[in-house]
Amino acid sequence: MVENRLSSGLEDYLECIYNNIQNKGSVKAIDISRELNVSRASVTDALKRLASKGYISYERYGKINLLDTGIEKSQTVIEKHQILTTFFEKILKLSNKEATENACRIEHVITENAFIQLKGFLND
């Protein structure tokens, strides 16, 4: 069974995995290590936790695959990031850099209801 709540760090790993698969077709631990600027040991630990929670499958030193639940969770985090960035840029008139930095922080803690309301606000 998949535990719905992940730490912000694990959500960042999922987001990184998803984006790499979308952009390059595959992802390995070394790619994640470089992109997130973390040690290979940290990546291995995160991958083990994500696999145990049912979000990914992976082979040591091999490809990392997102399972359906991992894809769904990744897409949710990415959507939150995009909506928040849009809000900060278009409504609050923040620079892209500042909007992105704030979206990265808030995407992990915004409640589902607040996100739905924000999304509705931007779509009106």
Residue ranges and their predicted role:
Residues 2-38:
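N-terminal helix-turn-helix DNA-binding core of bacterial DNA-binding proteins
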Residues 10, 81, 103:
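Short amphipathic alpha-helical/adjacent loop interface patches that line ligand
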Residues 15, 45, 101:
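DNA-binding alpha-helical recognition surfaces that contact promoter or target DNA
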Residues 29-60, 68:
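Canonical helix-turn-helix DNA-binding module
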Residues 39, 93-97:
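Helix N-cap / loop-to-helix initiation motif
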Residues 62-81:
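Basic, amphipathic "hinge/linker" alpha-helix immediately C-terminal to the N-terminal HTH DNA-binding motif
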Residues 80-91:
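Alpha-helical linker/hinge and terminal dimerization helices associated
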Residues 101-124:
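C-terminal regulatory/oligomerization modules of transcriptional regulators
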